């Protein structure tokens, strides 16, 4: 299953083996940099501090609110720090609801923010759901904030959608999948071979730079993103920093819907939205609402 995803695999022990997009690849091979390798999300404080300076995603909130009702039980797959489920718990009187994410740091933050006994944060793999989740059925299953983008191929996404369908309570239950809007991947082709740098200030007051290098595969609609942030210098004068290489499939409704149908699902509606921050700010996103066929 790891072959079909673009993140969260095992980290290489030898940082020189990580392949970054040009020109950041020169940092790895320079011989003057001592680097750490990160999964990027939640497991590296420097990247984490940068993320705190970006706009917190809310573009999928209204779509989720449109299908959630008082008394519902919700399963949020790839919940991160619980931003979506915590929001819904404030807006609705939910029954037993669960969020699951592979990051222990994200789940720790989720647990720290929970103020409801019926909201549960679980550290685990969304491809191997634990018994406390599989023994239940849910009114709404969510993949918020483009969670499915780390899935690179059709077969892997079908496995995940079939698993989500198996957790639905009845014919009135729904699955919510947040993706890019049709046409957005083509608009992102300008990012191919582009390098950007973003200044930000860390919580300790230090200024820092984060560098991004991109390679876009327009045939497979996969965006390769390499990232480097410098954290200082060591006693030998070498650069210290952290690197990560991410791959994201730019899923859209047109690409998702045939796979959903193969998974025994049908489309109820598609809700338009847009990217709130970053290089793709203002570009179209979409929330696809699915139900059992």
Where are these predicted regions, by residue range?
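A short glycine-rich, Lys/Arg-flanked "PGG" loop and its adjoining helix->strand segment in the class I
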Residues: 158-170
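Conserved class I S-adenosyl-L-methionine
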Residues: 3-70, 83
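Class I SAM-dependent methyltransferase SAM/SAH-binding core
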Residues: 83, 88-128
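C-terminal lobe and adjacent flexible extensions of AdoMet/dcAdoMet transferase-like proteins
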Residues: 249-293
């Amino acid at each position: 299953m790891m072959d079909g995803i673009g993140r969260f695999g095992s980290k290489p022990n030898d940082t020189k083996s990580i392949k970054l997009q040009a020109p950041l690849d020169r940092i790895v091979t320079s011989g003057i940099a001592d680097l750490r390798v990160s999964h990027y999300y939640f497991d590296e404080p420097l990247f984490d501090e940068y993320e705190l300076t970006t706009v917190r995603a809310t573009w999928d909130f209204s779509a989720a609110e449109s299908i959630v009702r008082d008394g519902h039980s919700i399963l949020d797959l790839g919940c991160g720090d619980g931003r979506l489920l915590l929001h819904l718990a404030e807006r609705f009187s939910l029954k037993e609801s669960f969020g699951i994410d592979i990051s222990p740091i994200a789940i720790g933050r989720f647990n720290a923010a929970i103020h409801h006994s019926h909201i549960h944060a679980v550290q685990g793999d969304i491809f191997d759901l634990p018994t406390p989740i599989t023994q239940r059925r849910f009114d709404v299953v969510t993949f918020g904030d483009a969670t499915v983008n780390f899935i690179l191929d059709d077969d892997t996404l079908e496995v995940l959608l079939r698993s989500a369908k198996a957790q639905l309570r009845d014919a009135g239950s729904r699955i919510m999948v947040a993706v890019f809007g049709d046409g957005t991947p083509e608009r992102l082709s300008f990012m191919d071979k582009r390098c950007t740098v973003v200044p930000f200030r860390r919580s300790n007051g230090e200024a820092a730079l984060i560098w991004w290098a991109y390679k876009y595969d327009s045939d497979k609609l996969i965006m390769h993103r390499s990232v480097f942030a410098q954290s200082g210098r060591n006693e030998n004068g070498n650069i210290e920093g952290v690197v990560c290489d991410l791959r994201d499939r730019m899923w859209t409704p047109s690409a998702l819907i045939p796979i959903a149908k193969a998974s025994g699902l049908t489309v109820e509606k598609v809700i338009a939205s847009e990217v709130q921050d970053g290089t793709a700010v203002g570009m179209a996103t979409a929330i696809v609402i699915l139900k059992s066929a």
